[in-house]
From Swiss-Prot:
GO biological process entries: sensory perception of taste
Glycosylation: residue positions: 84, 127, 248, 292, 312, 368, 428, 487, 527
Organism: Macaca mulatta (Rhesus macaque)
Cytoplasmic topology ranges: 588-602, 657-681, 749-760, 806-839
PANTHER family assigned: CALCIUM-SENSING RECEPTOR-RELATED, TASTE RECEPTOR TYPE 1 MEMBER 2
The protein's name in its UniProt record: Taste receptor type 1 member 2
Topological relation to the membrane, as annotated: Multi-pass membrane protein
Lineage: Eukaryota, Metazoa, Chordata, Craniata, Vertebrata
Name of the coding gene: TAS1R2
Length: 839
């Protein structure tokens, strides 16, 4: 503590040189315990470079601040109210000592005055735990720069300090400022309220203007950091020159203002956020009026959000919509009358225990200025006033607890700063229906309000239009705003218009808010919660049209009974089944006749039975595929059809052998007959077909699969094979080979006896099958949609009909209509005729 005390002692010389008598009872009220008050009754923004370190500026030479006097009156009112309250600090008189700090120009001298004892001396001690300064606590000052200056002194002595409007986040550092508390929400809450306001009205293209002091720079940086995490962009940021209203601007400063307003005119952004003390804005808004910059939305920081002097520039009503962020309004009963009460008309002050005081305790024009703005102040509600009011009450309640006043009497004793500070941290009471307590950072939970400037005679000049609650971090109670636009439409401030649903953003330039809107392609969608700059592909079972924000399920396509192609194929299959069944009955009844035996005898019944089974399998092609239906499609149906084709091929070969090869190769023919050559051949072909079927099923499986229709991606084709076309080629290969073999042997037997000459019928059946299969393969090579399944089934049924009617039909015709040709004698005569022709 010794180095710090030495520093205080050296500065204390300044205090003793500059002390002078007090002149006005506004600033002093004697009491058992004094509160120090620091208020800006006059303001000067520029540094006082002409003063040396022994000089303190005379605040009365600067511009009067009506708001500052209003806040000082709030402290006086609170102290008077507490002194008249028998339940709070009974028999204890609370006093005050208040000083005008000229905004930032006069802070060190008042704080030294408060720290000194009644003899204006600050003794150097090793331990200040038992030191009693002039005041027990300090209320103020109002801005962050001044608060930090004062807090650096007061924190050395743990003298409680409660600021009512400083919002800098640096003040939350309790290691650096252990004795500092505040009754105003921190800067990050003010910034968040602005951001939520902009998000609510979809303003993502803004301009930021800041003052050149710490307040402007810090808050501008906080806003920039917050916007870096969101979708709001800063078109540009400019620093306003520090110009006081009663000072002449330099040519450079004037040109700077002209340039800034010109830039505002040229920008497409129509929302302007301004972080600046009110005094620097007077000349700026005069330049805005001169250049007639209209149509903007001005968002005011708390430093000028409810400033009556700027509001008095009534021509601003034509410049756009003014919105401000400020502390909630809490009406204080009786304060409106007290604010304009002449202090000389009140009760005379008690004799001071000391005739010494400090300078800057006068404001001759404050009362008159307050009277001129009283209507505005009254209608606007008590906002920052309540922060001063609650700060005084917080100290009073802490002092009440420290003095043990809970039983109706107080024990008056010396109060050490650290003792009172400890009690202030613990206060928790209700004041005008609002809870007063401090969080670990020393902040009090007050919500913020968004106010709109209005200029109607009967209107609230600062009408509340929304509330911001820091704990929930959201706007509530949003009311209609009177926009200064055509038809009262909400102003638009966007670098780019919002993309429609299903459009991605293509960045243009360096700002994420500037972009082009590109439609998402079919099959993709835009998930805005994940990425607004890239369209995502739909899942494999879903699809989307162009410019969609979501995908829809693809329609599953398979043959259905209500479709016309399915009905046609079903009718053909029914016709084939009935005709084949009729042929089977006819052949059964005429089994012993030469016509049936020449057609193959028992082999015919095998073929007809397999044809019936094949017709019965046709319904498995209709409806959604299952494992069982896929098995029938891939195994049972191909096997039946292949055996039928093999029977025809073997039968053709057998007839040729009987009439042409038996005489030339008698030994081979004898083996063919002895070892049942036809059935062995058919068994071999059947086994070969079964092997190919098993290989195909092992390669592809039996579980139904889906594939996208290449002609209509909204459709997903359900099939039994992931590679339906290649599988069909593989299964058809052996059948095509057998058809070629059957056709070849039938052609070789074209000169055989008429009753055994089946070349025409086999040629018809095999040629039809070969042609239809080749056509199907050609169709499938060019088209891979759902029609492939329909064409495959149609061709299959037609091939079955070709065998049923083309091969067996003529024989039934002969049996039924030419029975005289179905006799052994007729067949023998035909064989004899063939033999005679050969000879």
């Amino acid at each position: 503590m010794r180095p710090r005390a030495t520093t205080i002692c050296s500065l204390f010389f300044l205090l003793r040189v500059l002390a002078e008598p007090a002149k006005n009872s506004d600033f002093y009220l004697p009491g058992d315990y004094l509160l120090g008050g620091l208020f800006t009754l006059h303001a000067n923004m520029k540094g006082i470079v002409h003063l040396d370190y022994l000089q303190v500026p005379m605040c009365k030479e600067y511009e009067t601040k009506v708001i500052g006097y209003n806040l000082m009156q709030a402290m006086r009112f609170a102290v008077e109210e507490i002194n008249n309250d028998s339940s709070l600090l009974p028999d204890v008189l609370l006093g005050y000592e208040m000083v005008d700090v000229c905004y930032v120009s006069n802070n060190v001298q008042p704080v030294l005055y408060f720290l000194a004892q009644e003899d204006d001396l600050l003794p150097i001690q090793e331990n200040y735990s038992n030191y009693v300064p002039r005041v027990v606590a300090v209320i103020g000052p109002d801005n962050s720069d001044a608060v930090m200056t004062v807090a650096n002194f007061l924190s050395l002595f743990l003298l409680p300090q409660i600021t009512y409007s400083a919002i800098s986040d640096e003040l939350r550092d309790k290691v650096r400022f252990p004795a500092l508390l505040r009754t105003a929400p921190s800067a990050d809450h003010h910034i968040e309220a602005m951001v939520q306001l902009m998000l609510h009205f979809r303003w993502n293209w803004i301009i930021v203007l800041v003052s050149g002091d710490t307040y402007g720079r810090d808050n501008g940086q906080l806003l920039g950091d917050r916007l870096a995490r969101g979708d709001i962009c800063i078109a540009f940021q400019e620093t306003l020159p520090t110009v006081q209203p009663n000072q002449n601007m330099t040519s450079e400063e004037r040109q700077r203002l002209v340039t800034i307003v010109d830039k505002l005119q040229q920008s497409t952004a129509r929302v302007v956020v301004v972080f600046s003390p009110d005094l620097t804005l007077y000349n700026f808004f005069n330049e805005v009026l001169r250049q007639n910059f209209t149509g903007a939305v001005w968002i005011a920081s708390e430093s000028w959000a409810i400033d009556p002097v700027l509001h008095n520039l009534t021509e601003l009503r034509h410049m756009g919509t003014f919105l401000g962020i400020t502390i909630q309004s809490v009406p204080i009963p009786g304060f409106s009358e007290f604010r304009v009460r002449d202090p000389q008309a009140g009760p005379p002050p008690l004799s001071r225990t000391s005739q010494r005081s400090t300078c800057n305790q006068e404001c001759d024009s404050c009362l008159n200025g307050t009277l001129s703005f009283n209507n505005v102040l009254r209608l606007s509600g008590e906002r920052v006033v309540y922060s001063v009011y609650s700060a005084v009450y917080a100290v009073a309640h802490a002092l009440h607890s420290l003095l043990g006043c809970d039983h109706g009497t107080c024990t008056k004793r010396e109060v050490y700063p650290w003792q009172l500070l400890k009690e202030i941290w613990k206060v928790n009471f209700t004041l005008l229906d609002h809870e007063i307590s401090f969080d670990p950072q020393g902040d009090m939970a007050l919500h913020l309000e968004i106010v709109q400037w209005q200029w109607g005679l009967s209107q609230n000049p600062f009408q509340s239009v929304a509330s911001y609650y820091p704990l929930q971090r959201q706007l509530k109670k949003i009311q209609d705003i009177s926009w200064h636009t055509i038809n009262n439409t909400i102003p638009v401030s966007m670098c780019s218009k919002r993309c429609q649903s299903g459009q991605k953003k293509k960045p243009v330039g360096i700002h994420i808010c500037c972009f082009e809107c590109i439609d998402c392609l079919p099959g993709t969608f835009l998930n805005q919660t994940e990425d607004e700059f890239e369209c995502q592909a739909c899942p494999s079972n879903e699809w989307s049209h162009q410019s969609e924000a979501s995908c829809f399920k693809r329609r599953l396509a398979f043959l259905e009974w209500h479709e016309a192609p399915t009905i046609v194929v079903a009718l053909l299959a029914a016709l084939g089944f009935l005709s084949t069944l009729a042929i089977l009955v006819i052949f059964w009844r005429h089994f012993q006749t030469p016509m049936v035996r020449s057609a193959g005898g028992p082999m015919c019944f095998l073929m007809l039975t397999l044809l019936l089974v094949a017709y019965m399998v046709v319904p498995v092609y209709v409806g959604p595929p299952k494992v069982s239906t896929c098995f029938c499609r891939q195994a049972l149906f191909p096997l039946c059809f292949t055996i039928c084709i093999s029977c025809i091929a073997v039968r053709s070969f057998q007839i040729v052998c009987v009439f042409k090869m038996a005489s030339r190769f008698p030994r081979a023919y004898s083996y063919w007959v002895r070892y049942q050559g036809p059935y062995v051949s058919m068994a071999f072909i059947t086994v070969l077909k079964m092997v190919t079927v098993v290989i195909g099923m092992l390669a592809t499986g039996l579980n139904p699969t889906t594939r996208i229709d290449p002609d209509d991606p909204k459709i997903m084709i359900v099939s039994c094979n992931p590679n339906y076309r290649n599988s069909l080629f593989f299964n058809t290969g052996l059948d095509l080979l057998l058809s070629v073999v059957g056709f070849s042997f039938a052609y070789m037997g074209k000169e055989l006896p008429t009753n055994y000459n089946e070349a025409k019928f086999i040629t018809l059946s095999m040629t039809f099958y070969f042609t239809s299969s080749v056509s199907l393969c050609t169709f499938m090579s060019a088209y891979n949609g759902v029609l492939v399944t329909i064409m495959d089934l149609l061709v299959t049924v037609l091939n079955l009909l070709a065998i049923s009617l083309g091969y067996f039909g003529p024989k039934c015709y002969m049996i039924l209509f030419y029975p005289e040709r179905n006799t052994p004698a007729y067949f023998n005569s035909m064989i004899q005729g063939y033999t005679m022709r050969r000879d």
